[in-house]
């Protein structure tokens, strides 16, 4: 009796999952057609808006990846920085290793675009990941490095972000 119920539940769940994926794919296909007809600058703006509108949805990552490609093609540092920020934010919750790789790629983009908030915010997220991994040594070495960069770049908000991360570290331990 229980086996039949479990099988029926699994079938219902998988059917729902399949239909949701098909619906999402068709929406993205339609969007691809609309985006292809837009001028370059409008395409960047639309992709950026779509990525920021769906922060809790998987399509958020897809839009951010499309924004990254489009911004690279158009050599637009502003939107390139936005795309990196969104992808780092996504991977912060899903895949720390990918987050760190993207962070290395994004740092020069953030600095060249003078987007210090994104630079320091993402560097500080890295401190939180070391805290989650219980890597105390890296928590403090990264904090020290970021504080030094904050001073060099004359961006006191960077130090504030680090102070919050360290306060969180101490309150969690």
What is the role of each PLM region?
Residues 2-8, 21-173:
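A "functional boundary" signal
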Residues 8-17:
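Bacterial N-terminal signal peptides
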């Amino acid at each position: 009796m229980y086996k039949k119920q479990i099988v029926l539940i699994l079938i219902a769940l998988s059917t729902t999952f399949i239909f949701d994926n098909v619906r999402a794919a068709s929406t993205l296909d339609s969007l691809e057609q609309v985006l292809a007809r837009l001028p370059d600058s409008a395409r960047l703006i639309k992709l950026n808006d779509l990525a920021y509108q769906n922060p809790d949805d998987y399509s958020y990552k897809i839009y951010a990846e499309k924004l990254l490609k489009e911004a690279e093609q158009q050599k637009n540092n502003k939107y390139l920085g936005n795309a990196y920020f969104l992808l780092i934010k996504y991977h912060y919750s899903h895949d720390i290793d990918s987050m760190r790789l993207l962070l290395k790629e994004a740092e020069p983009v953030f600095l060249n675009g003078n987007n210090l908030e994104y630079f320091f915010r993402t560097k500080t997220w890295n401190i939180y990941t070391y805290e989650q991994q219980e890597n105390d040594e890296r928590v403090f070495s990264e904090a020290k490095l970021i504080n030094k960069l904050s001073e060099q770049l004359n961006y006191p908000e960077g130090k504030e972000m680090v102070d919050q991360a360290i306060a969180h570290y101490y309150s969690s331990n």
